[in-house]
Amino acid sequence: VIPPNPLNELTEATFKKMITGNLSSRVRRRFQKWCKTKRKSFILIVSLPISDNDFVLFGASFESRTSKYPFKFDNKVPQKNKGRKKIGSKEKKSKNGSFKITPVYITRFDKEYRVSRTSQEYDFLNKKVVIVGLGSVGSFVANNLSKMGIAKLLLIDPDFLTVDNISRHYLGIDSVIDNIQKVDALEDRLKKENPDLEIECEGIRFQEIVRKNPNLFHEYDFVFSCVGDTKTNFEINHFFRKIGKTVLYCWLDPYGVGYHNLLVSPPNNGCYMCMNYENGYLVNNRASFAEENQIFEKRLASCYSSFIPYNVIAPSSLANKAIEVYLQYLDGEFSSENRLISEIGSNKQFGKEGFTYSVRYYNCLKNSDLLNVALRTNTSCPECNGDYKVDICKSE
């Protein structure tokens, strides 16, 4: 099929020849049936295959002052001498006349086309993902997954967006003014940007969801945990290991001096709790680039408003890295082991304020291979030893 020459006048005959000669018998019958209804105007869009998996679109608008048949098809059996003119007869002009035809520019907006424009190698069109925690990190993770064509998201967060963290969150000041929960505000924003995305929201704590409906997570393929609370992550770790779901834990160090992704698949060695125990005792996360026993929280507005400083670069960078790890997981790179993947962030303000780096930070500076390591089972870990007995499916 060759598209019409833009330098030549477009006619109904041009389109009729191009279309009817390249349709299957089933589609041709449907097209002929459509043509048997009179119309004053319509737009015809033609799909032209250019490869096995790709096609282009072109089309035209057809307009007439009166209702007419779009194209004329003669399905009658030819009769002998039917086409022979009688002597002295005059040829009758068609009462149908012709349409005014104007070329139109066709722009695709379907999901498959948008995803293909990103050079995406992975098929996200049937993937369903859970995001627990929609703070600065979780909001950017949700946005990235939406842009990449994920099929469905389950968003979990009980909090409202506040002015205190608006400068480092994907959502804007309008979400603060409307005084709605993060899950609802993020759903509204993502649906406006990607109408094809299916979103399920839960504006309550993860623990409450598990107690009320533990089967909610069964249809989902993957979990991002972007919460900043260690105890909640312990419970997330315990629950999803129990039901066999892979979780990617994403967290930031104070001041954005480092950020970390921990991929935990239940069949493999190690878990999130392994990072928080040493010699049988609970300790600060062992992946951290900040030495323990330091106070990083600041208070500006009031005694009730505390925060740990970092700018928007840190959560957006962590979210981008988290998506990269997810892609590697889908590609089978971590099928036999759990993985801790760290990145060194900005250290200017951290050092300026006199904070101390951890031993791991200096070790990673000397040997960058230590930033990406396989997770091993910690003999002190209560979860891996079977000693973690908390059952969040039961009421407190």
Residues covered by each model-derived region:
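Flexible loop/turn segments at secondary-structure boundaries
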Residues: V137-S139, L161-D164, E208-V210, K231-N233, ...
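Generic, well-ordered alpha-helical scaffold segments in large soluble proteins
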Residues: F140, N144, M148, L186-R189, ...
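Glycine-rich phosphate/adenylate-binding loop
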Residues: V1-N96, H218-F222, C226-E396
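A short acidic, amphipathic alpha-helical/loop segment
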Residues: N144, K212-N213, F234-F239
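A structured beta-alpha segment of the ubiquitous adenosine-cofactor-binding alpha/beta core
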Residues: A185-E219, V227-T230
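A short, basic/flexible loop-to-alpha-helix module at the beginning of a structural domain
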Residues: F99-V129
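Glycine-rich phosphate-binding loop and adjoining beta1-alpha1-beta2 segment
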Residues: P158-P195
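Glycine-rich adenosine-cofactor-binding loop
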Residues: R117-F160
